[in-house]
Amino acid sequence: MAFKLASSPHLKVQLQTQSVMRRVTLCALPGVAAQFYFFGWGVLVQVMLAITIALLSEAAVLKLRKRPIISTLSDNSAVLTALLIGVSIPSIAPWWVVVVGTIFAIVIVKHLYGGLGQNIFNPAMAAYVMLLISFPVQMTSWSVPLSLAQTPMDLSLTLNAIFGAMTPEKLSIYKYGIDGIAMATPLDTVKTDLSLGLTITESLSKTIFSDGFGVGWFWVNVAYLVGGLAMLKLKVIRWQISVGILAALFVCSSFGYLLSPDTHIGPLFQLFSGATMLAVFFIATDPVTAATSVRGRLLFGGLIGVLVYVIRTYGGYPDAFAFAILLANLCAPFIDYYIKPRSYGHRAGS
């Protein structure tokens, strides 16, 4: 048997940025496909529009900065950022929402700080928060899951809705489910019902919760979980941040549910609602804006999990992940400063 010989140093080859971004994007596709299946063509339209704007914006900035355009665009980082923005906003949001958000993410959050590897905030989440604060109506107008829609939207109707060829009166028809109730995310629905004095049990009796978690959202989270596990298998991401988030969110929500089940949703609902699995595996694990040491990553993830629970339970934004991740991004340098990896040659007890 012939063996391949190589001279020292025998170093493990790290994945290049292009390969990492491509693998993350491919692993996110099951989640995107699930969103498309349950919520229609708008998901794909928003993603494709975001990718187009991201590439054009990055090319324009690179030209102004006199940096190589083709080689930089080929690292796929702009595509991944655009994908995350596209799946995070309502599928029938006006076209200019995703355009403004994508330009903000690429030009301001990414390149204003020096480009890839220099940004202190996650670009996709910074853009999402900016859009949510600036355009709350458009960012909370979610479409009805196709299985609950009074009038499902095909591709033509979706394009008309996104690009402004549909009157607000006609568009409102597609925002109502078969029970006549305007749709929101399951977390939004629970939050609103609790503010009206309903119990969790009463809220979960609505049509949107016919599968126990929120029609469509459970399987979307399962799809992103599958993609996340694939990334762990491929060693694209480290496990500490994801485990830290899930553990902290599970523990906090379990205590809340045990203390007051009428006003606190259970841990499984927390884990499989909203953008939980998308954020846990595809957003919070961004190595540029996260802590770097093993213990630091666990603390970073735990901080996000606690913040998500607190904001979801007591704050005004039910999903909470975008705010939690940005706050954790602020804390990452502090975590790295005080929690450093052990250096080689360290003697136990010294």
From Swiss-Prot:
Any keyword Protein biosynthesis?
Answer: no
Question: What's its membrane topology?
Answer: Multi-pass membrane protein
Cofactor(s) in the UniProt record: FMN
Q: What class of enzyme is it?
A: translocase
Question: Taxonomically, which superkingdom?
Answer: Bacteria
- UniProt keyword Hydrolase present: no
Mind listing the UniProt keywords for this protein, alphabetically?
A: Cell inner membrane, Cell membrane, Electron transport, Flavoprotein, FMN, Membrane, Phosphoprotein, Translocase, Transmembrane, Transmembrane helix, Transport
One cellular component term (GO) for this entry is: plasma membrane
Q: Where found in the cell?
A: Cell inner membrane
Q: Which family does it belong to?
A: Belongs to the NqrB/RnfD family.
Purpose: Part of a membrane-bound complex that couples electron transfer with translocation of ions across the membrane.
| Name under which the protein is recorded | Ion-translocating oxidoreductase complex subunit D
Organism of provenance: Shewanella piezotolerans (strain WP3 / JCM 13877)
Taxonomic placement: Bacteria, Pseudomonadati, Pseudomonadota, Gammaproteobacteria, Alteromonadales
Its gene is: rnfD
